[in-house]
Amino acid sequence: LPDLPPAMPMEAPRSLIEPQKSRKDPSLPLHALLVFTPHDLHACLSLLDARWEKPHRLFLSDVMVGRYGGTQTAVLGPMLGAPQAVLVLEKAIALGVRRVIAFGWCGSLQPHVAIGDVILPTEAYSEEGTSAHYPVEEPVAPSPSLMKSLRRSLCEAGLTVHAGKVWSTDAPYRETEGKVRAYQARGALGVEMEMAALLTVAAFRRIDLAGALVVSDDLSRLVWRHGFRDPRFLQTRKLLPGRLLEALTAESPSGNRSPSGKG
């Protein structure tokens, strides 16, 4: 594995550009679902009541607000990769979001993690370029309350859930045999593109965030096998939108956390 860059000082200088609400930006509710893929985004939006008439544009993503079970909830997406996901998350926090679930796909790195299973990241090995710009205590972890809600909601639906480490990369076409073996040895369950950066920003800004990743393909045997048409993958994606919204709206954000730029 490549050497890590030198650690940044924990008290970083203030950025010259800070995310903030402009005159044309709407206020957003406390709860938000970040959805990486267009089809899953539409499935999540279909479950909201009393939605806005049209979405608000946020960088390359759309934002829609409605109610789920009586709770005002924002759904944002699609998005691809750490830089875009962090831009959207940073702006969403500036507009009022405090409790976030990220919904995406991942590749399996372990034989016991099957296509159609769900991984709840507990930590992420960063091989993306965004999280290094945010000085935080390492390793960063997801919100305990959101993890508890996710486990309960997904297990109640009969889904197979694995909680563990993931590998976040900027280069899916450079997932080499050597890297896969190295991250397998470190115990990583899956590989994806966004979670290391999202968890880091959530820690830096002191908001609650967790992720749920559907296993879409398999690298565990050092041969790529996709499952994009696998019935198990399709069924899990069908079940997840409602289960994630249930977990997201089950509780309010942690009372001891307020957005910060000091980690």
Could you tell me what each predicted segment is?
Residues 47, 149-157, 201, 243-251:
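Generic non-transmembrane alpha-helical segments
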Residues 139-186:
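Active-site rim beta-loop-alpha module in soluble metabolic enzymes
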Residues 196-232:
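Zn-dependent metallopeptidase/amidohydrolase metal-coordination segment
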Residues 221-257, 261-263:
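His/Asp/Glu-rich mid-to-C-terminal helical/loop segments that flank catalytic regions of hydrolases
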